Amino acid sequence: MSAQRLALLTPHRVAASDVDALLPAIEAACAAGDVAAVILRLAPADERALTALVKRVAPAVQAHEAALVVACPGFAGDLVSVATRGGADGVHVDKPAGLKDLRERLREGRILGTGGFETRHAAMDAGEGGADYLMFGGLYPDGEAPDAEGVRARAAWWAEIFETPCIAVACAAEEIPGHAATGAEFVGLESALWLADPAGVARAQEALGGAA
């Protein structure tokens, strides 16, 4: 397996008023380790406002050769349009009903990621629907963390059988080595692990090396 990389998850419901504080934290975190992607979890707003927000964040992420992937749970508008017009590299959707349609619309190499699976069958459907990666774990919008052991079990099952890459998301630092040991191509870091202190990314990078 090629070297594992990191994915950073922002807090849920990022709004335009959060961006000034978020940008320097993202840049410092991306510089501190081998970050493949930042998943930007936006608060629902109108498409024009969301597009403007994405335009502000995308250059900061892409300057570090990382991909910006946009998520917006509860948004009823056109997330693909927001991502493409904002210059993002892709979109992330949970429990998608129209994954194949999204896949057809996301062209020019843009990324389609998905998560929020309640069953293995749902995960397999997502893989067959054209997702570029599957994400296991991550804080729920209410701030509750999933069972870390369950996240590891699902990620290990997926990584062993399927070719589509997966992200195993750590909500606490002590989860990182175990998540890395699943064989997942990426280990995700919740914002508590990097937002206030970019050194958390460097420590996570060291943990990946120890799990290899």
Language-model features: where?
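Conserved N-terminal beta1-alpha1 strand-loop-helix module at the mouth
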Residues: 1-92, 106-132, 146-149, 157, ...
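Acidic, Mg2+-coordinating phosphoryl-transfer loop and its flanking beta/alpha structural elements
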Residues: 187-189
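Short, acidic/turn-prone active-site loops that include or flank metal/cofactor-
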Residues: 95-99, 117-119, 138-141, 191-195
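Conserved active-site neighborhood of the chymotrypsin/trypsin-like protease fold
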Residues: 102
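Short beta-strand-loop elements within alpha/beta enzyme cores
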Residues: 133-137
